[in-house]
Amino acid sequence: MFRTLTVVPLLALGLSLSACADLGQPTVRADLLDQTGKVTGTATFSPSPIGTRVSIEVSGLKAGPHGLHIHENPNCNPGPDAQGQTIPFGAAGGHFDPGASHNHDGPHARNDQGHGGDLPMITVGEDGKGRLNFDTNRLKMTGPTGVLGRSIVIHADADDYQTNPAGNSGGRERCGVFQAIN
């Protein structure tokens, strides 16, 4: 009887700790800048029991859905697009693609089927404010699928989740570089 009472709680503790293994990851945040350099929101990625909790708040955008993506480079300066023209936040580079899929896809595709950086759209209200919260197991804060040392970009238009390279989601409206906050 004593062994059963001892083993069962220890087994439950071990299972709960293994489910929280990713909770050792740092929390990272990006201040979202507009094209003038003004901070207009934040994107925070933090550990959650299923992987990563994503929380985004932004203001000053037109009403409606906006494409949202993790980009390769930790740089929000102007830079060249695929055609070599300088665009706002172009130095952020292309979409983060840890699975080397070379394919724009929806936010629920596996990393080997679509860019790991393709996120759900953020919807902005008539007041110009948007908020998005979700959990994902496709991205972490560090490691091969980590966002630390990368950027996040909010685009001008909705993402069609199929057109390469950016889902036909228009220009880059907001950008932020992820930094560890703990």
Swiss-Prot record:
Binding-site positions, Zn(2+): H95, H104, H115, D118
Subcellular localization, as worded in the UniProt entry: Cell membrane
Cofactor binding notes: Binds 1 copper ion per subunit.
Lipidation (S-diacylglycerol cysteine): C20
MF annotations from Gene Ontology: copper ion binding; superoxide dismutase activity
Gene3D superfamilies: Superoxide dismutase, copper/zinc binding domain
Catalytic reaction equation(s): 2 superoxide + 2 H(+) = H2O2 + O2
Family, similarity comment: Belongs to the Cu-Zn superoxide dismutase family.
Name under which the protein is recorded: Superoxide dismutase [Cu-Zn]
Gene: sodC
